[in-house]
């Protein structure tokens, strides 16, 4: 009986902390941000990753700069 009471109060306290700190709202907003129509529709951000103006020497220089970063 002591274990059940301790677990009950632990989960009750956890629920109170989660609702007061806004964890549930943060998780909901994160999921909606990842799964919303706008997020699913806006998948063309990868197009900007390729820059044809950079030469092989530029890529090597960038590689050496970020080698120890």
From Swiss-Prot:
Tissue/organ expression: Expressed by the venom gland.
Additional free-text comment from the UniProt record: Shows a low ability to inhibit hepatitis C virus (HCV) infection in Huh7.5.1 cells.
Name of the protein in its database record: Peptide Ctri9594
Residues of the propeptide: 36-69
Cellular component GO terms, alphabetical: extracellular region
Origin species: Chaerilus tricostatus (Scorpion)
Subcellular location: Secreted
Signal peptide: 1-21
GO biological process: regulation of defense response to virus
Keyword line: Antimicrobial, Antiviral protein, Secreted, Signal
